[in-house]
Design a protein with these regions (language model features):
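C-terminal alpha-helical "lid/dimerization" subdomain adjacent to the S-adenosyl-L-methionine
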Residues: 4-7, 11-15, 19-20, 136-194
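Conserved alpha-helix/loop element of class I SAM-dependent methyltransferases that forms part
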Residues: 21-40
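Class I SAM-dependent methyltransferase SAM/SAH-binding core
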Residues: 43, 49-97
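A short acidic, Gly/Pro-enriched loop at the edge of an enzyme's catalytic core
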Residues: 96-107
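A short SAM/SAH-binding and catalytic strip from SAM-dependent methyltransferases
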Residues: 106-120
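A short glycine-rich, Lys/Arg-flanked "PGG" loop and its adjoining helix->strand segment in the class I
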Residues: 121-136
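Active-site beta-strand termini and strand-to-loop segments that position acidic
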Residues: 196-198
Length: 198
């Protein structure tokens, strides 16, 4: 029995309060490292509670925060309202429908969710349909390491070991959907980033 909405990606639940902030103390640095630049129109795909959405909105022209979970979107909305930011739309919808929900945009950001996507080919195709001709798609994901080896605040964290993907597996999956690999970076302590274009 699950209380997740239909279409929820496996192993992508938002964490309990505390350790997420400990893992991502400087979201601006992560976003800059994967190619986000001021003035872009951006989709934060599978945006969750808005931890990265807030930082994206500080420099973006406009942000579309898309998530399947309307409750998490309300948390994200509240986070941005408290910060006085008004350049974000919150859209409850399926990631596979991204091109119908928003876009075309300069940048699509997907953090901590690609490992749980059942049909990665379909998602990559959908992302391609929501990007401008020179747009970028950035995935931030957990390294393929045993969960016991990725502790935060003294506890193993992140998706189950068997769900994790190497950068190479991620690149192969996205390229199969028609996007072109541009760059790979390491994001300590436990993540990597891969950037794609059309």
């Amino acid at each position: 029995v699950t209380d997740h909405p239909p279409g929820f990606f496996q192993g992508t639940e938002m964490p309990t309060a505390g350790w997420w902030e400990a893992l991502w103390p400087d979201p601006a640095r992560v976003l800059s490292a994967v190619g986000l630049r001021p003035g872009m129109n951006v989709i934060d795909l599978c945006s969750g509670d808005g931890w990265f959405t807030l930082q994206i909105a500080k420099g973006a022209q406009h942000v579309f925060a898309i998530d399947i979970d309307p409750i998490l979107l309300e948390v994200a909305r509240h986070r941005l309202v408290e910060s006085g930011l008004t350049n974000c739309e919150f859209i409850a919808g399926d990631a596979y429908n991204i091109a119908r929900l928003a876009g075309p945009v300069d940048f699509i950001f997907l953090a901590n969710a690609f490992h749980g996507v059942p049909d990665r080919f379909r998602l990559a195709k959908a992302v391609g349909g929501a990007l401008k001709a020179n747009g970028l798609f950035a995935i931030v994901n957990w390294h393929k390491r045993p969960r016991d080896e990725t502790p935060i605040l003294g506890e193993p964290r992140g998706p189950k070991t068997e769900l994790r993907m190497s950068p190479e597996e991620t690149i192969e999956s996205v390229e199969a959907g028609g996007l072109k690999f541009r760059k790979k970076i390491d994001i300590p302590p436990y993540h990597y980033g891969v950037i794609f274009g059309l």
